[in-house]
């Protein structure tokens, strides 16, 4: 299935950098904190 979900795996450096950029925006919009 193209575009389907994959098994969770540790984030590589590129993925972690993206997550670090969007996390503050997500927290601000949802008024929640994520670890």
Curated annotation (Swiss-Prot):
Function: Potent inhibitor of cathepsins L and S, and papain.
Molecular function as annotated in GO: cysteine-type endopeptidase inhibitor activity
Region (Disordered): 1-35
One cellular component (GO) term of this entry: cytoplasm
InterPro entries: Cystatin_dom, Cystatin_sf, Prot_inh_stefin
Organism: Sus scrofa
Keywords (A to Z) from UniProt: Cytoplasm, Protease inhibitor, Thiol protease inhibitor
Source organism superkingdom: Eukaryota
Name listed for the protein in its UniProt record: Leukocyte cysteine proteinase inhibitor 2
Protein family according to the UniProt entry: Belongs to the cystatin family.
Biased composition (Basic and acidic residues): 24-35
Site (Reactive site): 3
Location of the protein in the cell: Cytoplasm
